[in-house]
Amino acid sequence: MKEGIHPMYSDATVKCLCGNTFQTRSTRKEINTEICSACHPFFTGKQKLIDTAGRVERFKRRYGQV
């Protein structure tokens, strides 16, 4: 690698809106995020299946059980 052309890669603090913080490495000193593995529904197991406006039922009525 050439000297002086690459950004400094140092320790960084990641802060989530839920209050969770953790350390990683980045070219930035602080990273703010809206969602992390501590509050994301996929990782917490609080995932909900949302059927918006009965689209599944409407599909089944229209095309039947294939």
Curated annotation (Swiss-Prot):
The species this protein was found in: Pelobacter propionicus (strain DSM 2379 / NBRC 103807 / OttBd1)
Carries keyword RNA-binding?
yes
Which residues of this UniProt protein bind Zn(2+)? 16, 18, 36, 39
Keyword Ribonucleoprotein recorded:
yes
Protein name according to UniProt: Large ribosomal subunit protein bL31
Please provide the record's keywords in A-Z order: Metal-binding, Ribonucleoprotein, Ribosomal protein, RNA-binding, rRNA-binding, Zinc
Fill in the subunit field for this protein: Part of the 50S ribosomal subunit.
Q: Which InterPro entries does UniProt cross-reference here?
A: Ribosomal_bL28/bL31-like_sf, Ribosomal_bL31, Ribosomal_bL31_A, Ribosomal_bL31_sf
Which PANTHER family does the record associate with it? 50S RIBOSOMAL PROTEIN L31, CHLOROPLASTIC, LARGE RIBOSOMAL SUBUNIT PROTEIN BL31A
Q: Which cofactor does it need?
A: Zn(2+)
State the similarity comment. Answer: Belongs to the bacterial ribosomal protein bL31 family. Type A subfamily.
Q: What is the role of this chain?
A: Binds the 23S rRNA.
Give one GO molecular function term. metal ion binding
Q: Which gene encodes it?
A: rpmE
A GO CC term assigned to this protein in UniProt: ribosome
Biological process (GO), any one: translation
Copy out the cofactor comment: Binds 1 zinc ion per subunit.
Q: Sorted alphabetically, which PROSITE patterns does this protein's record hold?
A: RIBOSOMAL_L31 (PS01143)
